[in-house]
């Protein structure tokens, strides 16, 4: 439990400074990253040739490293929580008093919830690591009075709304599509994994004797939760597949929503 708690703290505190330690440079604060990204995005758009210049590559690469670090930590947390869940199950089934059984059951429920949150964080950061440009666009302060960024965002909106093509816009649309293709693939794998987990738990439940009703109920509850989570990811997968097939309208909605 201590390891899991420590990993939770590291997961939220370590990615930004750790990403700064890698080759390619870093940023002292998130505000510095946003300023670099904003100016790089304006220069990229004004260039008009669809080539991502170093001014934009540097902050986007940093954001990719941030996602990689966070994904690794989230994956480690998922593994630790899975092992903790196994030990909690053993404690639950071997508890000799009602108080111990209740405590183990509550810990098992908390572990399952935290595991689902860790899985969500893992999936989101894998997506960001695969398509960091589109992920980084979410950092742009589109609602701020910065005239250069505001003008660029206005042009992007206009071109997306009117269908005016440009090399720079083509890069944005292509990466936005890749961003959603990545989530569709990750979501499909996650859905399959959760369904397999539910089947495993249900079969394990069936092997328990009728006299171990509390254990059967706990396994059934976790299996049902896994199925519900799988259904959620199935919907996410379908939505991202749809967006990847028609990325321009969704990208327009993104830029309009940010302003």
What are these regions (language model features)?
Residues 14-62, 66, 130-175, 242-259:
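Long, glycine/tryptophan/cysteine-rich extracytoplasmic
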Residues 217-259:
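A cross-kingdom marker for long, charged
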Residues 1-9, 22-25, 99-115, 214-226:
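Alpha-helical transmembrane segments and their helix-start/interface "positive-inside/aromatic belt" motifs
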Residues 42-103:
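N-terminal extramembrane/targeting module of integral membrane proteins
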Residues 5-8, 108-124, 153-157, 228-232:
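Alpha-helical transmembrane segments of multi-pass integral membrane proteins
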Residues 16, 20, 79-106, 122-132, ...:
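Cytoplasmic membrane-interface segments at the C-terminal ends of transmembrane helices
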Residues 2-24, 79-88, 114, 118-119:
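Polytopic transmembrane helical bundles with strong interfacial aromatic enrichment
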Residues 64-79, 108-113, 175-199:
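Transmembrane alpha-helical segments and their cytosolic interface motifs
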């Amino acid at each position: 439990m201590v390891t899991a708690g420590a990993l939770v703290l590291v997961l939220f505190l370590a990615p930004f400074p750790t990403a700064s330690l890698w080759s390619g440079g870093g940023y002292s604060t998130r505000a510095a990253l946003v300023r670099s990204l904003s100016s790089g995005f304006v220069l990229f758009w004004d260039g008009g040739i669809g080539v991502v210049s170093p001014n934009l590559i540097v902050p986007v690469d940093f954001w990719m490293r941030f996602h990689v670090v966070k994904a690794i930590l989230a994956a480690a947390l998922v593994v630790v929580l899975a092992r903790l869940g196994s030990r909690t199950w053993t404690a639950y089934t071997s508890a000799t008093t009602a108080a111990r059984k209740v405590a183990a059951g509550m810990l098992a429920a908390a572990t399952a919830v935290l595991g689902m949150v860790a899985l969500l964080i893992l999936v989101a950061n894998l997506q960001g690591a695969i398509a960091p440009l589109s992920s980084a666009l979410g950092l742009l302060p589109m609602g701020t009075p910065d005239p250069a960024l505001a003008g660029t965002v206005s042009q992007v909106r206009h071109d997306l709304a009117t269908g005016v093509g440009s090399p720079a816009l083509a890069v944005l649309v292509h990466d936005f599509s890749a961003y959603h293709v990545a989530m569709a693939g990750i979501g499909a794998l996650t859905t399959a994994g959760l369904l397999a987990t539910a089947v495993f738990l249900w079969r394990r439940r069936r092997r328990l004797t009728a006299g171990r009703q509390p254990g059967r109920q706990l396994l059934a509850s976790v299996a049902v939760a896994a199925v519900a989570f799988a259904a959620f990811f199935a919907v996410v997968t379908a939505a991202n597949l749809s967006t990847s097939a028609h990325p321009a309208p969704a990208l327009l909605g993104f830029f309009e929503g940010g302003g």
